[in-house]
């Protein structure tokens, strides 16, 4: 793929490209695997000096596919796609990445999408993951350079994800609030997490959307990305998610997985500098629970 930039100050090409998230590894790939660097239309080395107003163009060679991923057909719900990014509305019940004896995963489904459309880059790059039984928006990069640029936004916490959750308990919630509590591995499990002073800093904010008595619908924003963060934080408040029996959630409301849905995803497209905002409607199982709660409340 070819990208073009205009130089703002005097430096060497490699230093200029570093400012545009071209890593040493990617620069080596350009040099040794068939890529190119041009300055004002002339091919040059990475050490070539450039000056204000010069135009630097690069061609990044195509990537070899992951040998571990299998292209598995699946009717993907594609929310958005361009040359750099793919946004999928993930159904619950599917993990993000494969594991032993579990091939029906979003990574393999996206791999099939890339292969069946004969995309030049067929390596799958997951930018934002979701747990197996969480539904909603997932962001994929369609090549390594796009992934590197989005990793920078992840580090800067400028990718914004909002979740809807149904929680249950007697704890009163304010109209909006913050949960700041460190999360650590559970001493008795390699899977579960807990709030503990030995854990890593974790910050969750929420807004109360609807109150059905013991059950509440909340809109949640993560400021950190700890494993099971939403599930652990709300269980810590005495408000576990419906269907989340791993953290004490009730199975009495007809939802068979944790009631958690990523409904909004916002980020800055690093290539166009435009804000990208994508939305996803609630799933049918979520809607059914809410409808039943509203009926009982009325």
Describe the role of every protein-language-model region.
Residues 1-298:
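RNA pseudouridine synthases
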């Amino acid at each position: 793929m070819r990208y073009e930039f205009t130089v703002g100050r005097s430096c060497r090409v490699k230093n200029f490209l570093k400012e545009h998230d071209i890593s040493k590894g990617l620069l080596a790939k350009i040099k040794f695997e068939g890529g190119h660097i041009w300055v004002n239309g002339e091919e040059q080395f990475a050490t070539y000096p450039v000056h204000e107003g010069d135009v630097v163009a690069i061609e990044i060679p195509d990537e070899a596919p992951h040998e571990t991923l299998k292209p598995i057909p699946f009717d993907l719900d594609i929310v958005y796609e361009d040359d750099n990014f793919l946004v999928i509305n993930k159904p619950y019940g599917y993990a993000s990445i494969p594991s032993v004896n579990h091939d029906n995963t979003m990574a393999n489904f996206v791999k099939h999408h890339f292969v069946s459309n004969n995309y030049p880059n067929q390596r799958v790059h997951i930018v934002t993951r979701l747990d197996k039984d969480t539904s909603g928006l997932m962001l994929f990069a369609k090549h390594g350079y796009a992934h590197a640029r989005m990793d920078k936004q992840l580090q800067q916490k400028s990718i914004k994800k909002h979740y809807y959750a149904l929680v249950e308990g007697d704890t009163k919630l304010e109209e909006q609030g913050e949960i700041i509590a460190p999360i650590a591995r559970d001493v008795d499990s390699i899977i579960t997490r807990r709030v503990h002073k030995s854990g890593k800093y974790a910050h969750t904010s929420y807004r109360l959307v609807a109150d059905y008595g013991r059950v509440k619908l909340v809109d949640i924003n993560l400021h950190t990305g700890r494993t099971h963060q939403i599930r652990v934080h709300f269980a810590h408040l005495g408000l576990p998610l419906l269907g989340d029996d791993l953290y004490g959630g009730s199975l009495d409301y007809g939802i068979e997985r944790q009631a958690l849905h990523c409904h909004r995803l916002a980020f800055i497209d690093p290539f166009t500098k435009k804000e990208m905002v994508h939305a996803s409607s609630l799933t049918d199982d979520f809607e059914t629970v809410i409808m039943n709660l509203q009926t009982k409340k009325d």
